[in-house]
From Swiss-Prot:
InterPro entries reported in the protein's UniProt record: AMMECR1 (IPR023473), AMMECR1_dom_sf (IPR036071), AMMECR1_domain (IPR002733), AMMECR1_N (IPR027485), AmmeMemoSam_A (IPR027623), Uncharacterised_MJ0810 (IPR023472)
Name listed for the protein in its UniProt record: Protein Smar_1309
PROSITE patterns per the UniProt record, alphabetical: AMMECR1
AMMECR1 domain sequence ranges: 15-210
PANTHER family the UniProt entry points to: AMME SYNDROME CANDIDATE GENE 1 PROTEIN, AMMECR1 HOMOLOG
Entry-linked Pfam families: AMMECR1 (PF01871)
Domain of life (superkingdom): Archaea
Classification lineage: Archaea, Thermoproteota, Thermoprotei, Desulfurococcales, Desulfurococcaceae
SUPFAM superfamilies xref list: AMMECR1-like (SSF143447)
TM ranges: none
Length: 226
């Protein structure tokens, strides 16, 4: 592993995020259409060569404008450089997500790419486990739950999509880890949080923007509750 400091998502510019999303799509298209595994571009700025953690999410865009998940895989540890992590997570999401069949060429015009850049997970330490929800900000934090061999994570965007509160977010991450929903109350269970910034295509191969997940949560979930 590199001795360089891992990239924190707050260091990225919007142009950095745009580059990563375009790179994720290019990696998948080159592999699918030409059987080529792309290499990281040369002469990249230093930030892309430092260790980084990314998740690539691929969604299918339907005629009614709604999207459904098509693949999502990534890295929670700074094993690769930021650029390598983006390429590898994109390929894994497209071809090796066990929940879905491998992506097909005819789908390329109807899929949307989203790259989430993560900070290193940090354990949340509290004296009273009931204080854990107060340590989480929906739209900013993703969660990791770990106990022995059991481990699961949910990205910051997930509670927005379902309008979960903090306790539900904790419980659903417990379930993702293969544990009981109230596992977060167990002192032997380790709870970690990390920050994430998500960059996304508006349309397939279209404009790329950064999601304001805190605003999305406030606006979308308030509307749903009403």
């Amino acid at each position: 592993m590199s001795d360089k400091k891992p990239v924190h998502p707050s260091e990225l510019s919007i142009n950095d995020g745009i580059f990563l999303v375009k790179l994720a799509r290019k990696a998948v298209e080159e592999k699918l259409l030409r059987g080529v595994s792309i290499e990281p571009p040369r002469d990249l700025p230093e930030i892309f060569l430092r260790p980084g953690m990314t998740f690539t999410t691929i969604e299918t865009l339907h005629p009614d404008g709604k999207t459904t998940l098509r693949g999502c895989i990534g890295f929670l540890a700074p094993i690769y450089s930021l650029v390598e992590s983006t390429i590898k997570s994109a390929l894994e999401a497209a071809f090796n997500d066990p929940r879905f069949p491998p992506l097909r060429p005819e789908e390329l015009d109807n899929i949307i790419f989203e790259v989430t850049v993560l900070s290193e997970p940090e354990e949340i330490i509290v004296r009273n486990r009931w204080d854990l929800p107060n340590m989480i900000k929906i739209g900013k934090h993703g969660l990791v739950v770990e106990k022995g061999w059991f481990k699961g994570t949910l990205l910051p965007v997930v509670p927005i999509e379902y309008c979960w509160d903090e306790e539900t977010f904790l419980s659903e991450t417990c379930i993702k880890a293969g544990l009981q929903p109230d596992c977060w109350l167990d002192p032997s269970v380790h709870i970690y949080s990390y920050e994430g910034r998500a960059f996304r295509e508006k349309l397939p191969r279209g404009e790329i923007f950064e999601r304001d997940m805190i605003r999305e949560y406030r606006e979308i979930c308030r509307r749903m509750i009403r």
